[in-house]
């Protein structure tokens, strides 16, 4: 421990010696009865607390705390977080110098206490002018395994992963959208703990590990979205996956209406999955239990309640399952143990104005700045000489996509209308000249935006979706097609196959839809289809 640390409590700069630090921590331990141990760059207070019997608290009981002053320690932090409830474990990340690393994890005994901590302590002024951030901590136990031979079955993948890694609980494998006898070339491997998943990733990550003669790709799977129980109790939409490409919305509606005619409000289908809207929640829940595992057009379907995207402004970007602990921005992330050296975290790519819509996040992109020293040699290049993972916006991806297919650049046409409350609303129509004579003459989302940037980004996302451009970590399920998808006669295209998410989601609150054209300006194309949500 350092001999001296600067304590800025009450806005003054006073020096607290290492001996004083130690005395303060010992006093805290004596007062609470908790043990404290330092290991692997973190100091653990409790875990379990005195008198605890039984297993640790379940997933969802831990919160992440960011932007902690570097000279603040458990004797000051623990009393603050005890206001929300009983602390099971407090883990403060530490530097070799004895300072903390600016962030910590607090595990409560119940989920309710963790949620209360987020509500009352996020943006809490811990010292004059110093505000901490508190959000849910996602304990990721799932790895993404890519480049798997498509003919391998779930049992084969499970057996192989158990041979090469420890703690494997389950493997999630999804059938191909076009051939249900094959997998999609990737799987999600569930481990018994985050530590087991981290050890497996460490073993497999070098890039030289092979399964069945194939060099596999390994990364943290995107953590499943946590939605509070109160919100889920209002969900009336089912997410249906593993459908045949040829299955129509009419067929899906008919199948889900069999148990109670008239219960289904509408169906929206994209490729091999769909959202089934019900008028009443109880009918949705009943249909889920009846239809899960049933066959439609020869395909065994999976049915779950669709998870809304939280419309609140949260920090959600993670870097390979890990936050940047030095960042001044608070980031929700998936991994908890290994530090990340980058000092500038990746900001959200598209604001919550689009209600959960996010620009494509290319594989392993790193958003950070580096020093630009005088005399640094620079070489002129074309953006088209770069790889797709150098672009972060859908607009740039679409331009890149067209160039790689030897198409002319996309043409953007801006339209506007005025809302009932007088706001100017915008939407872009995109024309791709190379395919304009095909079955899809243009692309236009059925949502209106209030800013030019959002309108352009949304239109590009919509277009990429209908060009079979798969986003790696985005959910763009609220976009409805304007007309039929591209025909098989479309000019050959360079595919951009990316890692899909392991969970469904949909916007909790939609942007303004074009489905009702009563207030739409004269120049605006009006979609005759209702929006997703």
UniProtKB/Swiss-Prot annotation:
Residues 61-139, 141-223, 236-308 form the RRM domain. InterPro entries: HnRNP_R/Q_splicing_fac (IPR006535), Nucleotide-bd_a/b_plait_sf (IPR012677), RBD_domain_sf (IPR035979), RBM46_DSR (IPR044462), RBM46_RRM1 (IPR034434), RBM46_RRM2 (IPR034435), RBM46_RRM3 (IPR047837), RRM_dom (IPR000504). GO terms for cellular component: cytoplasm; nucleus. Pfam families: DND1_DSRM, RRM_1. Disruption phenotype: Male and female mice are infertile and show meiotic arrest in spermatocytes and oocytes. Severely impaired spermatogenesis with a complete absence of postmeiotic germ cells and a marked decrease of spermatocytes in meiotic prophase I seen in adult testis. Spermatogonial differentiation is impaired in developing testis. RBM46-target cohesin subunits display unaltered mRNA levels but have reduced translation, resulting in the failed assembly of axial elements, synapsis disruption, and meiotic arrest. It comes from the Eukaryota. The keyword Transmembrane helix does not apply. One of its GO terms (biological process) is spermatogenesis. Residues 338-362 are annotated as: Disordered. GO terms for molecular function: RNA binding. Expressed in the testis and ovary (at protein level). Expressed in spermatogonia and spermatocytes in testis (at protein level). PROSITE patterns: RRM (PS50102). Keywords: Cytoplasm, Differentiation, Meiosis, Oogenesis, Repeat, RNA-binding, Spermatogenesis. It is found in: Cytoplasm. Essential for male and female fertility, playing a crucial role in regulating germ cell development by ensuring the proper progression of meiosis prophase I. Regulates mitotic-to-meiotic transition in spermatogenesis by forming a complex with MEIOC and YTHDC2 which recognizes and down-regulates mitotic transcripts for a successful meiotic entry. Required for normal synaptonemal complex formation during meiosis, binding meiotic cohesin subunit mRNAs containing GCCUAU/GUUCGA motifs in their 3'UTRs regions and positively regulating their translation. PANTHER family: HETEROGENEOUS NUCLEAR RIBONUCLEOPROTEIN (PTHR21245). Interacts with YTHDC2, MEIOC, MOV10, CNOT6L, DDX4, UPF1 and PABPC1. This is Probable RNA-binding protein 46. It comes from Mus musculus. The gene is Rbm46.
